[in-house]
Amino acid sequence: MLTDPYTHMEEAFGLDENPFPAEAISSGAETECYSDLVFPEETHEFRLKMIRGGLQGGRKTGFLWSMSPSGEDTGFGKTTLMRNTARAINRDFGAAVQENLGIKPARIKPIVAAFAELNEQSRNGLYPVLFAATQNLAGGPDAVMPAIRQQLLAKAGDDKDRMWDMIMESQMQIAPSGQALRRDMLEAFVDSDNGLAELLSGVSDASRLRNGIQYFTGALYILAAAGIEKVFLMIDQLEDLGKKGALSAAKRRREIGRIRDMLEIEPFASRLHMSFTFHEAAARNLALDWDANRLPSFDTNPANASAVVVLRGLQREDQVEELLNAWMEPVRNEHAGTSPISPFTPDVLGILRSLSQGRAGVLLYRASELLYAGAEAQVGEIDGAFARQHFAGHGHLAAVAASDDDAGADYDDLLA
C-alpha cells in the first residue's frame, strides 16, 4: 500500500523529516548542522590564520575566499565556517579552540567572537553590521553577554554600582579618548542578563545606521572589563558593498574607509580582529576603493598566505558522506538503516558531488530534492541508478562536466 512521501521517510528511510535545506542558502539557524570533519584541513587553516594569527601574529584582518574552476564561487561553506567558528569560540571563551590550535596553556587568552553579514536591505554599510554584531553578542544561541554580566557581577561582589564603575574604568584604560559609552546601553546591561538584548531589539533602523559603531564600541568596553582580550568579528557578504546599485560610489568609498578607521583607532586597533568573506566578483568590485584606502591586501597570492584561506569545495566522496551524515543523524529514528548515509547508497555520493561542483550548499539542496523524490517513488533505498534517472529527467546532469574524475565516468552517456 502506497503512503505519502513523509510517512515513507519516517518508516522506510528512518528519518523523522527531510533534514536537508530546501534552498541552497545558509540560514544561520541554531539547528543548522555542522561537522568539522567535512573540511578538516580548511577549518583548521581558517582558525589557525584568523585566531592564532590575531593573537600571536599581529594580524588585524583576514580573508576567507571561495574559488572554483567554473567561476561559481558561492555555496562553498564560507558562511557556515564563520558562524560555527564563532560558536566554537563563544562556547568557552575560546579555550578549546586555542588549545586545538597548539597554543600553550599559559598563553590561552579569553576571547569572544561575533558574526554579522551585510545585505542589500538594512545592512548595506559598516555601522548597521556592527550593530548586528552587538546583537549577536547579546542575544540568541551565540550570546556571551549574559555570562559576561554574571562574571562582572561576581567580581563586583553583587554590587551593580561597582559593576557600572568597573566598566567605566575599562573605557578609560583602553580608549581614554575614544567614544563615550552610551548610558542607555550601560543601564540595560547592568540591570539584567537579558537587558542588553531587549534594549537592542527596540533600536530603530535609523539609529542602527547612524549609531551602530557606538553600540559595538560599548560592547568592547564591557568585554574588556570582564577580561576579554580580543574580539573576533566575522563579516559575511562583503561583496554587497560593491554590487551595482547597492551604494553610490561615494558611499562605498566612505564605508570602506570606515574599515580602515577601525584598524587605527582604539578600542578597535588593539582589541579587534576582522575576517571577511571574498570571491572573485567581490574582489573586482571592491579593489579600487580597497587599495585607495591602503587596507591590508586580500589577494590570494603566496605573499599574502598568512591572511588568506581559500575554500575549493568538496573534493572527495568521504567529505560528502560526512556532510550528509551530519544533517541526517539528528533526525534518525528507530527505522533507520545502519549506514551513515542511509537511505542513500555510496554510489550516490559522487553524483551529488559532481552535480553540485563540490559546493556544499548546492549539494545539500540537491540531496533534499533527491530524498523527496525517493520518498515519493516509495523506493527502499536511493541508489546511483535512481539518482541518475532523477537528475537526467530534470536536465541537471547536462551541466556536469564529463571529465569529473570519479562520478562523471559513471554516467557519460547522460551528458551527451
What are these regions (language model features)?
Residues 1-63, 88, 95-96, 103, ...:
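A short, basic N-terminal segment
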Residues 1-18, 44, 199-348:
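The catalytic "switch" region of P-loop NTPases
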Residues 8, 129, 147, 151, ...:
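Charge-rich, solvent-exposed alpha-helical interaction surfaces
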Residues 46-55, 85-93, 133-137, 219-226, ...:
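Hydrophobic, Leu/Ile/Phe/Ala-enriched alpha-helical segments that form helix-helix packing faces
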Residues 56-228, 360, 398-412:
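P-loop NTPase nucleotide-binding core
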Residues 67-71, 114-120, 278-282, 367-371, ...:
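Short beta-alpha junction loops
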Residues 78, 252-255, 356, 363:
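Active-site-proximal structural scaffolding
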